Amino acid sequence: MRQAYDVVVLGSGAAGLTAALAAATQGAERVAVFEKAGLLGGTTALSGGTIWIPANQPAREAGVEDSREQGLEYLASLSNGMILPELAEALVDGGPRFVDFLNANTEIRLRLVRGYPDYHPEHPGGLPGGGRSIEPALVSFAGLEEWTDRIAGDVRRSLIAETPLGGGTGVVPPDVLAEREEAKQEGLGRALIGGLLRACLKHGVHIATRSRGLRLLLDDHVVAGVELETPDGHQSIHADAVILATGGFEYDPDLVRDFLRGPLTKPVGAPTDTGDGLRMAMRIGAQLGNMREAWWSPIISYPGVRRDGGGNALLSARERALPGSIMVNRYGRRFCNEAANYNALGGAFHRLDESRLDFVNVPAYMIFDQSMVDRFGAFGVGPGGEMPDWVTRAQTLDDLAEVFGLPAAELRATVDRFNENARNGVDPDFARGESAYDRWPGAGHAADPDSPRSALGPLEAAPFYGAEVAISALGTKGGPRTDREGRVLDVDGDVIPGLYAAGNVMASPAGMVYGGAGATLAVAGVWGLYAGRAAVQDRGRTARTD
């Protein structure tokens, strides 16, 4: 039996489900989502669910002063020539439209994460006091029945704003948690996926898992469907439009080696991110862009395997910025502003030593002391709590150096210098604490939240702790180039009829930039919306131009 749809979407993360819902609400009667994995949601379901949108409605309602022009100025200040102005405009203009779309078509309601600074807040157009990071309010999964267990990620009945990283205490009262459990309410990335999934099902979107896209079907140079690998064998699915939302290629070692600018040693997103959509687009002559870049992040791995088969890891964005911690390379030396945002730190890990011709900061080691544990806690453990078994503990810095194979004398000298400067509230080596973003994790505990001391404190209270830090990525940022509405372009810059892309599979409109918390999902949501609508609007055309 011939299977045919108006629109086929490959991938079920925020980009894919938004695209499917956009197509269905635009008038497409037959829409299907095919997901490679056995679980829905992709990397979105594993995420915090935060979305970075300049001049967003929740911020405006909270009295935050922001504008389209400020958002564009901010992105331009960070571009380094890698952001195309027309795509930056599409991103900034599309953000509020995405919020409106969710309000009109789903139960998802986005709320401001108050105070969360942009990742480079002192740049022109940046917001040191926050206002661009918004997150879904709790979403009820009641009525989703078996679909609830088919979404990746762990159940989280909390908000980013309730966590220490989001400015909260990290403690939700037991009676509140009980109420949320009874109502089947969830937060973070699963809330975003659950809300989108319910809306897709309501609009009759067909959802199938364990269905991997292999190659695109062409009819006289027009994309006319896709060949799938399914539990029932290979199937040819015909469609007026195909939207690629398959995620990045961080789990494919060959693609990582051939394209990325430096090491990516331990990916943390959905394990199905092996470049399927990229390969499909390459086979039919798609133009590629931004292939060197990823949404970089240092991570600390810990034992265990997630439900989707990926390894457990922590971004440690909070711990790296707290007083009483530093990060050193294999030579026992600091090499960066540890409190900087995780994407920017990718550059520090990719620094090539010209004499050794080696990435000397890979791996790195986070070192902290008992005073940090007592004041702040770490890795999900509250202040004064016992550190997990996978965190190395030693009574002296020399003992810690021996465990990690670091030169003890160099480590001691590094800590001595850092301690002296920290007591004076300065970091002349890497300017840690000078940015509002650096100070955000520790500001709530500081006498002066605007002082660098919010991010600086000596390491001197035994025992000392350490953990290996690898360079990872939340996803890659390179792939087929698109126009501002998600249409995939060929090597000559012309539209490939019938093919669209959204999310991490595409050449990111953000270039090398990570504007603030939620920038990945902003691209996913905005281009999912664009691609889904364009796929319906373009139906019946045999050729297209920008």
Task: Describe the role of every protein-language-model region.
Residues 37-63, 73:
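Conserved N-terminal glycine-rich FAD pyrophosphate-binding loop of Rossmann-like flavoproteins
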Residues 355-463, 534, 538, 545-546:
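Helix-rich C-terminal "cap"/substrate-channel and partner-interaction subdomain
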